[in-house]
């Protein structure tokens, strides 16, 4: 088993594709990505380093049945982590959003995961600068004007995705390896 676990929730399949691309680029140091609707709490807790990916739905929500998803996803999986101790774990987040059509909640669901893992004792790495994005609001921005993780816009900036992932992974490797 590798030391990095990649977990994602997806509604349209875009987050799954990005998770698979990240896995490919990590070249053997991460296990294959797991969809949270099929993952167990034990699998999640078995990794010292976690890469968590989510799209943002509706008004800045995690995917899940209550957000209108067809299947269980992050909303339901986070319930299984309510008492989990993530102390000693390192977490990095990536989120998908549409900064033009959902400008008022761009990648805001990343903040929900961020708050959850911080509250459970994890160390979060992989912040990303705000520059290069045009949106009106994101809950995923920290006070230092950086995102809590890597924001990706597959609708409007798909041509920047691979370069952003490469830069982000280089930063993560320095932080955790």
UniProtKB/Swiss-Prot annotation:
One of its GO terms (biological process) is nitrogen fixation. One of its GO terms (molecular function) is electron transfer activity. It holds the Pfam family Flavodoxin_1. Keywords: Electron transport, Flavoprotein, FMN, Nitrogen fixation, Plasmid, Transport. The keyword Flavoprotein applies. Residues 4-173 form the Flavodoxin-like domain. It comes from the Bacteria. The keyword Glycosyltransferase does not apply. Its cofactor is FMN. NCBIfam families: flav_long (TIGR01752), PRK09267.1-5 (NF006739). PANTHER family: FLAVODOXIN 1, FLAVODOXIN 2. Low-potential electron donor to a number of redox enzymes. NifF is the electron donor to nitrogenase. Belongs to the flavodoxin family. This is Flavodoxin. It comes from Enterobacter agglomerans.
């Amino acid at each position: 088993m590798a030391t990095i676990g990649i977990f994602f929730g997806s509604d349209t399949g875009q987050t799954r594709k990005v998770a698979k691309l990240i896995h490919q680029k990590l070249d053997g140091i991460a296990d294959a990505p797991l969809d949270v609707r099929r993952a167990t709490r034990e699998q999640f807790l078995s990794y010292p380093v976690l890469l968590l990916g989510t799209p943002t739905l509706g008004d800045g929500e995690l995917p899940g049945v209550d957000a209108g998803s067809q299947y269980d996803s992050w909303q339901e999986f986070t319930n299984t982590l309510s008492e989990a101790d993530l102390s000693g774990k390192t977490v990095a987040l990536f989120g998908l959003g549409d900064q033009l059509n959902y400008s008022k909640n761009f990648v805001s669901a990343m903040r929900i995961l961020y708050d959850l893992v911080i509250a459970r004792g994890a160390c979060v790495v992989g912040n990303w600068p705000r520059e290069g994005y045009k949106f009106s609001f994101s809950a995923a921005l920290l006070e230092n004007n950086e995102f809590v993780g890597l924001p990706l816009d597959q609708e409007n900036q798909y041509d920047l995705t691979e370069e952003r992932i490469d830069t982000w992974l280089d930063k993560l490797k320095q932080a955790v390896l």
